[in-house]
Amino acid sequence: MSEDNNNGKEYILDADSELRFEIEQKDAKVFVTLISGFAELFGTELVKKKKYEFGIGAKVAIFTYQGCVLQVTGKMDVCYISKETPMIQYINCHAALEQFRTDAEEHDKRGPVILVVGPMDVGKSTLCRILLNYAVRVGRRPLYADLDVGQGAISIPGNIATILIERPASVEEGFAKTAPLVYHFGHKSPSGNSVLYNAVVSKMAEVTLQSLDANKRTKSSGIIVNTCGWVKGYGYKHLLHAARAYRARAIFVLDQERLYNDLLRDVPSNVHVVLLPKSGGVVERTKELRHESREQRIKEYFYGNMRTPFYPFSFEVKFQDLRLYKIGAPPLPDSCMPIGMKAEDNKKKVVAVTPTSSLLHHILTLSFAESTDENVIGTNVAGFCCVTEVDMERQSVMLLSPQPRPLPPNALLLWSELQFMDNHA
């Protein structure tokens, strides 16, 4: 039910219903205020009388367990109230996880590790956000691991990352991305280098599981793992690999019964596999929208957003000062490989890259590794820069970077297929 007034429109929501809206127009802004009752956005409670702002690309679902009144101003492309919502099932999942965590706390063991899986555009990252928010609201400190290299919920696309969640996500900006643990992959899909993808997932899982033991509260809180939407063929094998690497206690499958049954067959019987419905508010994104979303994530890394703008630096680096590498050499048959090596080992080989004009717009990853003698694949990264100009005459590139010149001593840069067109005025 909705009522118009001079300050916009008031929506009266019954218990266990949600207001859904989308914003697609470029300069549109929508403001939402909780007038009365209790409501939450993906597990984060709304504060009464506080005005929340949403812009282009926002796909919002404000849920209430008890009923509420919301005031909404601004132009939305889609807006409606729905009583068909999976939130009750999601809160039941949280309750089950809390039982695991309480048991882990009492016996000083690791809390539950949960994989959230499903095809593209079924709400995997949203479910992760809900479960993480519910966990911190009851005093937990879970880890959040993001294996979705295509979109990047924690770091920029083309990488996998983990953060510690200590407080609920901001309604408008999501989780604070403080001190993330990030590993370079360099492609927007695991299919770009399946061998490398499994290697970096294994490494991050190893480090993340070890870090659980460093803090008692985090240890019992466990890990929520978001995964890619590639669930067939090699994509399915990547899911099984991730489940093994993270020693998953449970797998939440969104909206695909076939995937649910395949996992029931293929994972150990002590792993709980749970089929969950997706929200009716989940919107299927086109290829173009997914590309725009990647661009926006990279832009926010360099320039921030309306509320927290960043001011990156641009500086010149000579070719001779660039220590640039790529992970993965062209495949060779086993017969051409050195004794003891397999063709798949080439997929993890660190290869020097000669700077050319083809570097233009590519993202470069700054590794904490200082030489190729170190385990570059297993070393996390310090940050990213973007090649905004290549001057073959001057034998130099212009880099866009969050930090001023110069690059750190012994800086080792890794090539990524991800590109960013810096049109920022």
Curated annotation (Swiss-Prot):
CDD domains: SIMIBI (cd01983). Pfam families: Clp1 (PF06807), CLP1_N (PF16573), CLP1_P (PF16575). InterPro entries: Clp1 (IPR028606), Clp1/Grc3 (IPR045116), Clp1_C (IPR010655), Clp1_C_sf (IPR038238), Clp1_N (IPR032324), Clp1_N_sf (IPR038239), CLP1_P (IPR032319), P-loop_NTPase (IPR027417). GO terms for cellular component: mRNA cleavage factor complex; tRNA-intron endonuclease complex. ATP binds at residues 18, 59, 121-126. The keyword Manganese does not apply. Keywords: ATP-binding, mRNA processing, Nucleotide-binding, Nucleus. Coiled coil: none annotated. Its main location: nucleus. One of its GO terms (molecular function) is polynucleotide 5'-hydroxyl-kinase activity. One of its GO terms (biological process) is mRNA 3'-end processing. It is found in: Nucleus. Required for endonucleolytic cleavage during polyadenylation-dependent pre-mRNA 3'-end formation. Belongs to the Clp1 family. Clp1 subfamily. This is Protein CLP1 homolog. The lineage of its organism: Eukaryota, Metazoa, Ecdysozoa, Arthropoda, Hexapoda. The gene is cbc.
